[in-house]
Amino acid sequence: MRQGDIAAAQAALAAAKDVSAGLSEREASHIGFFDLVFAGRTEAAIAALYPHLAAWPRDALVVSVAANPNGVIGGSGRIGQKHQIAEMMDNLASHYGDDFWFTSYHAMALSEDGQLAAARAKIEQSVAANPNNAHGAHGFAHVCYESGDPDTARAFLSSWLATYPRDGFFYGHLSWHLSLCEIQAGN
């Protein structure tokens, strides 16, 4: 899904639905959520999201689709959507501890909600735990830039991108962020 191969994602969902007899409640709920997302039934997907995460808060695939700023909540058009994502991540945090992946997503949610100081602490924690995490690098660039510290974002991204594969998923996007910082610096 993340790679933009909609047909493959739809085929995987169809295959999952074909073998859904006898699945656990968790698996059925997971498939049901994604069925609603893929069908474009955003409000129904959001309604299914919260009970699913209440029962299975560590379903990281569902969390990632819900927490992404352009995901099911962020792309819903709802008023207050950024705050809803930050609140959801706050509520899930105790289930993830110091997990670098979750912490990077939580930091982005806080940043998008304007909670920049809290976001900075979390993104620094995430990057320290796994300096190779591209989502963490992305979050660090966002938080620094939005906090009025583009020089730190620029220095970080210049160094970080030097070792990241040019065909890596985030390479183009992080290069764009670096370009914004360069423009801000007058370059």
Segments (PLM) and residue ranges:
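Canonical positions in the second alpha-helix
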Residues: 16, 51-52, 91-92, 125-126, ...
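"A position-specific structural signal for the A-helix of alpha-solenoid helical repeats
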Residues: 31-35, 65, 105, 139-142, ...
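Residue at a conserved register position within TPR or TPR-like alpha-solenoid repeats
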Residues: 36, 70-73, 110, 144, ...
